[in-house]
Amino acid sequence: MALPRITSPHAKGSNRTQQVMLQVLLATVPGILALTWLFGAGTLYNLALASLFALAFEAAILAARQRPLAFFLKDYSALVTAVLLALALPPYAPWWLTLIACGFAIVFGKQLYGGLGQNPFNPAMLGYVVVLISFPVEMTSWPAPHGVAALDGIKHILGIASLPDGWAQATALDALKVNKSLTIDELRAANPAFGHFGGAGSEAVNLAFLAGGLYLLHKRLITWHAPVGMLAALFVMSLLFWNGSGSDSNGSPLFHLLTGATMLGAFFIVTDPVSGATSNRGRLVFGIGVGVLVYVIRAWGGYPDAVAFAVLLMNLAAPTIDYYTRPRSYGHRKPNSGFKLGE
């Protein structure tokens, strides 16, 4: 009896790139709904523009590289980058700001290195940091919750008309950084940006992204190592340097966990399988490094929220982390640590 020969591996996973990306997009829905409830249609406008621009840049570069458009566009990786970037940008951001951010994310953050699976940096965070440094006024103009009408927002995005004075307000992280003379209780009483534990409305947004992250964990699309490492490190750092609600306080552990882009970063950014560490121990170290850097930059740096900077800095360290945390090779007692000095 002739037995057929097949090439190994004989078992393969059921998750294709397209399916994984669709699951990630699905997991962002709770956060999108929370942001839309808080800021109105501005988040949806960002999502529509970012998706359009990201797909256009992706198609243009693929055409220039003479790659099949349909095959690569259908993996939805550009769409995931667009969604993460749109969620990080302020609602009702000008169209040209979204265009520049998407251009840097897709062209310089992804395609310049060869496309999906080759990028050393998280593309969405690279695009975000470029526009944050280049256009700080526009990037720090967050609208007050429930404070902008949909039509006025569209006019502002297109540059037809400006929004009324007072439409924007400082976020809780902004207020904490620039009002060091006030205690936490005084800030909470005087500033509507503060909620019970974190930023007003930001608590619900972070919990929504936490729900999406738990869905990804349930589907085994991510592991717990990087998110737990980041959140635990941020909690410990904020606990060590928390002195109550005095005027020199940097905020409580709950404040840091439920304010800004903490949960979005922990479950959707830090877990990037390409630009992060690859082993489980490496992912844990990577997440801890991000959490420490987030607190350091929030407390003593020049930017109120620091998830993007922390992730990009740890992207630089990811190869070194992989080098020292690589698992033991089969048949060897110790991990294969690569070359040694003197060899």
Curated annotation (Swiss-Prot):
The record's listing under Pfam families reads: NQR2_RnfD_RnfE
> Does the keyword Nuclease feature in the UniProt annotation?
no
Q: How does it sit in the membrane?
A: Multi-pass membrane protein
Q: Which enzyme class, named as a word?
A: translocase
The principal location of this protein is membrane
Which GO terms of the cellular component aspect does the record hold? plasma membrane
Query: Under which name does UniProt file this protein?
Result: Ion-translocating oxidoreductase complex subunit D
Organism, as annotated: Ectopseudomonas mendocina (strain ymp) (Pseudomonas mendocina)
Gene coding for it: rnfD
